[in-house]
Amino acid sequence: MEPLSEPDASDPILTITGPTAVGKTAVSLEAAEQLNAEIVSVDSRQVYEELTIGTAKPSPSEQRRAPHHFIGERSLHEPFSAGAYAKAANDRIRAVLERGRRPLVVGGATLYLHALQYGLADIPDVDDEVRDELNQRLESEGQDALYEELQQVDPRQAAETDPTKTQKVIRALEVYHGTGKPLSYYYENQPEPPFDYVTVVLNRDREKLYDRINQRVDRMLDAGLLDEVRDVMDIDGVQLDEPPLSTIGYREPIQHLKGDIDYDEMVRLVKRNTRRYAKRQLTWFRRYDEYHWRAAPETRAEDLIEVLKNALDPTHSAAEGSAR
């Protein structure tokens, strides 16, 4: 294979994404080894040190094959938002490039990926009292009155907001009253992301993907998922009803361990909810016309690198495939 030029900050960054259980880890490790790359994980749960089995975190042997970022770096006591992730990931990417290596973004957390590639509006925090007051007004005045106010103070945002989506109306008014500026101002002045990306979505036949999901859930349980959840439940100060513990693969075991559902129902729910999550991920990825789709079983690291080469040099031709 023709070697790539030395990495540069102006180069698009190869991103490998796809639904859960599609097989991103194996092919991304091969690509990282061939590219002399460091893997920048884009996963909203693998970043927590306490969550391993239920997040399908790369094993120690897999992590030794290439440097990994955002794997087990934070405690459950340290919330991590998509915006915070994007800022931290941009810093890591700069550091990787300064070391003369390529960053390779890998993962399927859709909002985190969007924040990294396209940015998020930098909206200041708003006092909870503002939202409380708006909710009281919702009760006394009704949603129509709040939407009419939004039309007056932020007509651009009102035009893009369904008046029946009450919480979105309240959020827009909350920003206006809390910051003195309309929500549309923050969206319109959103900073441009510092890097460009070329993204490959790995996909599989639906039934085969669902089979892989079911089998992976079984492996997680065999590997001790319930013990992991018990340990997490014993940590002082951890909120069991908030992310990441309210997410799939943790909330169902928590319900089981609390006695709310039996074991078989827990297994059924984890599998069903994970399949539904994979479907939502695929729907999200189809929003982006610039993404390249590939069939996971046939895709090798060389195929992914070929996509990167095409992005680096538009005159470099390669057959485009589709696995949507």
Curated annotation (Swiss-Prot):
Transmembrane segments: none
Keyword Magnesium attributed: yes
Keywords: ATP-binding, Magnesium, Nucleotide-binding, Transferase, tRNA processing
MF GO annotations: ATP binding; tRNA dimethylallyltransferase activity
InterPro entries the UniProt entry points to: Dimethylallyltransferase, IPT, P-loop_NTPase
Residues that bind substrate: 20-25
Residues flagged as site, Interaction with substrate tRNA: 131
Enzyme class name: transferase
Cofactor: Mg(2+)
Record Pfam families: IPPT
EC number: 2.5.1.75
Statement: the UniProt record of this protein carries the keyword Transferase: yes
SUPFAM superfamilies assigned: P-loop containing nucleoside triphosphate hydrolases
UniProt record, GO biological process: tRNA modification
Superkingdom of this protein's organism: Bacteria
Binding-site list for ATP: 18-25
Region (Interaction with substrate tRNA): 43-46
PANTHER family: TRNA DIMETHYLALLYLTRANSFERASE
Purpose of the protein: Catalyzes the transfer of a dimethylallyl group onto the adenine at position 37 in tRNAs that read codons beginning with uridine, leading to the formation of N6-(dimethylallyl)adenosine (i(6)A).
Family: Belongs to the IPP transferase family.
Subunit structure: Monomer.
Protein name (database record): tRNA dimethylallyltransferase
